Structures are given as C-alpha cells and as structure tokens.
Amino acid sequence: MALLSPLRAPAAALLALCLIAVPALAVDTSSASGQMDTFMRMRASSDGRDNFAAWWVTVFAVVPGERPREIFKTDGYNVGRFVKAEDGSAQFLSREVSYYKDPKTGAILKEWLNPFTSEKNTILHIANDPVNSRYPAPKPGEAGRFPIMAAGDDVILHLDIPLAYPNPLQPGEYPVESTGPMYLASEHFVFFSKTKDLEDAKAASVPVTYSWARTGPWLPWMKMGTRPGYLLYSGHGKKYPRFDDLPADVREYTKANFPQYQSSPASYVTPNETSWTYYRKQVPAPGK
C-alpha cells in the first residue's frame, strides 16, 4: 500500500496541494493550522513518536467481460513519524511492508499459481523504504488543506489520489513485467476518529480506523505484461502505537526478513520507493 502511503511521492505532492474548506468543529479543523494538527494526530502523532498504520486487504483481478476474481490478500503496515520544523512545516518519515497471502489459508506466500497464465510466479513482497512526504507551513488566513468533515460523533478525513507518471519498468526493458510506458493508478483513503478524542488537547495521537481502496496495474512479478485488466484492492486498517500491537504473523515475518521496518527511517531522504522501483532493484532487466 501504499499507505499515505499505501502516500507515494506523486500522491504526497497532490495531498500537500489539496485546499478544501470545511465546517468548523469543536476542535479547530477549518483553519490550515488546525487541520495540520488534526491530520498529524490522526495519521500518526504530533509529538514525533512512531505509529503503525496496519492494513488488511483483499486483491481482485478485473478482466474485461469477466466477474472480478479474488486472487490473494495482502496484510502489512506503514510505520511513520512526523518531524516538525520551527516554521510550522513538517516532514513525514515512513516505510512500509506488506505480505501477499493465500486467500483461503491466510498463509504468507512464497509462490503464486497464476490462474491467467498457468505459471507459478515467485512473489516479491512489498518493502518500500522510504515513503516520505513534506507539508509546508500553514499561512495566516489560509483555507484548510485537508478534506476533513464532521459526521455526528465522528471526524472523517477523505483522500482521493489519482496517479500518473512514467513507468519505472519500461516495456523495452521489462517486456513481461511492464504494463506500458505510463504507471496509472488511484488510491482512496477514508480515516475515522472520534470528536471527543480530538477534543483532548493533551492527546498527541488519537485512535483511528480507516478504509482503503486502490486501482492499479498488474504487479510486475505476476508477469502479465499488457494483458487487458487491472487490480482492485479493497481494504481496511487501524492505527497502533507499538510494533507489538501488530498481528503476530506480520510481526514475525518482519523480524525475520525486514527487521529495520520495526521503526521509521532515521532521516528524510528521497526519492521514495514503490513496488515498481523496488522490483527494478531486485530483478535487473534481462541482458543487464
């Protein structure tokens, strides 16, 4: 997932530019500074502590003329923290892992029998480091940047993030992994918190649940090339304050294979990693 990455670099830029006025709540979520504070407390913590946004996702293959087919699940998390500057701007330092699972047994997979090609594919799990973003300092009188709304006792943050940029895996270099010259996808988040939790000014972080949906191309390791169709991701998640709060199988697999993902990155670096750039690093193009 890309969490707020399940936020990639282009998505983070779109989010930072999103300027939407919203009704005022008992907590200040209408001004730019109030919304920045609310966003930080919902997404992670305003005091710089690590928080873990876990997710549970079902992945469907959508082929023209066919009923969408559940092909696997993916469970994982993003670990991130905010670093605030004296001028009011902030950086979000994060990285994320997600593991593909058998939809029936829930076991973390090493290989996957592709029902479309009848080939057995070696899985490359998601290990994106970093997944960073920047948020400029709020300006006096500036409208709110984030689409936050009140709904009864709840505060809801809704983000739609369309993505389009040159594919890191170009067809000439990766003929069976690439779906074309452009990477086209979209991510959709809805975060939920309680108004009463946000009204507690001493709470640097508040409980959050969220939903996540995504449309995206075939994954490189599926080796589907330009075959018509795409992937549809349907998931939900919850924020946790500690690594030990995550599901046991995700924790154990992470400790055994990606131990550095138990905490956020130490410093802000670019560019961000995606499943496509990670694949390029792990699997050199044929002939190279």
What is the meaning of each model-derived region?
Residues 3-5, 20-25:
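Absolute N-terminal positional cue centered near the fourth residue
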Residues 1-12:
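Bacterial N-terminal signal peptides that target proteins for export
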Residues 26-102, 110, 235-241, 248, ...:
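N-terminal segment immediately downstream of the Sec signal-peptide cleavage site
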Residues 67-201:
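Predominantly extracellular/secreted and cell-surface proteins with exposed
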Residues 10-22:
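Bacterial N-terminal signal peptides
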Residues 163-288:
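A eukaryote-biased signal for long
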